[in-house]
């Protein structure tokens, strides 16, 4: 089986993180999975949602928004949600997934009385925009929280570890990792896997497209996902250390100690 980009079945696309792409955000990164590129920002502001105040819920909150910019796809201009007057169902589903994934690795009590707004804006879509968004948002959060600690706005980072995501699927009767658009379009089975860096599952999304899949195929995809996420988590750690080390070596050291990494 030959993949469109010539990769091996268990090979990720080239992944990169460019920090501080949005200087006014508390933390930001441009994440690239091959030709999929997403700007992920974390804006942390004082105050919590009204429902938390009314119910006397301690700590802070984290929420996410996701959008595909009008020029992000090759199929013509995509109208903005504000022009349509409503959020489309796909974007709504994805931003809820991003929020759930980040809250799995954020101790909201340590966020104190702050709200973290996560924004993921797709610049270019070539498959895996939701998984790239989760992965990039985790890096943006790590940068934002450590900077707040350095500035004295938080006592300690509420991030308990990175969360990463990757797609898997069955393409031409073979399980593969990190699908590009052409593979995703033609795959008979599609999985999205979200995991923490210590290999705990956060969410699994999987379905057949006019097809079924066996427990053996699912196990193979899960193992591919576990392998890929291990590689992604290391890239996330390197990206955060590089971003913080440029301006604050102490923050990079605190982060390593916080995550118990050498």
Region spans (language model):
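A structural signal for small-residue-enriched, beta-sheet-centric alpha/beta enzyme cores
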Residues: 89-90, 110, 128-132, 141-146, ...
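Glycine-rich, flexible beta-strand/loop modules in the N-terminal catalytic cores of phosphate-handling
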Residues: 21, 28-111, 201, 205-218
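Short, Gly/Pro- and small/polar-rich lid/capping loops
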Residues: 1-25, 29-32
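A short glycine/serine-rich beta->alpha loop
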Residues: 82-87, 120-129
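Active-site-proximal mixed secondary-structure blocks
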Residues: 3-9, 101, 147-155
């Amino acid at each position: 089986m030959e993949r469109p980009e010539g990769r091996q079945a268990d090979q990720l696309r080239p992944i990169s993180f460019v920090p501080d792409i949005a200087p006014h955000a508390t933390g930001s990164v441009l994440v690239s999975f091959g030709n999929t590129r997403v700007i992920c920002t974390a804006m942390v502001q004082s105050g919590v949602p009204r429902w938390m105040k009314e119910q006397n819920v301690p700590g802070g909150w984290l929420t996410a928004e996701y959008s595909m910019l009008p020029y992000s796809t090759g199929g013509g201009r995509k109208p903005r949600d504000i022009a349509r007057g409503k959020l489309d169902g796909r974007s709504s589903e994805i931003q809820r997934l991003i929020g759930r994934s980040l809250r799995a690795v954020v101790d909201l009590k340590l966020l104190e009385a702050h709200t973290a707004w996560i924004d993921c804006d797709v610049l270019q879509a070539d498959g895996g925009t939701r998984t790239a968004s989760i992965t990039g948002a985790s890096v943006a959060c790590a940068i934002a929280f450590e900077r707040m600690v350095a500035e004295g706005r938080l006592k300690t980072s509420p991030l308990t570890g990175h969360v990463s995501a990757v797609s898997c699927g069955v393409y031409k009767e073979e399980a593969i990792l990190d699908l590009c658009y052409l593979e995703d379009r033609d795959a008979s089975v599609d999985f999205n896997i979200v995991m923490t860096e210590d290999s705990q599952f956060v969410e699994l999304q999987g379905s057949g497209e006019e097809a079924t899949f066996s427990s053996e195929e699912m196990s193979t995809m899960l193992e591919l996902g576990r392998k890929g996420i291990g590689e992604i988590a290391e890239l996330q750690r390197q990206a955060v250390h590089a971003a913080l080390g440029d301006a604050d070596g102490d923050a990079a050291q605190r982060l390593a100690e916080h995550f118990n990494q050498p």
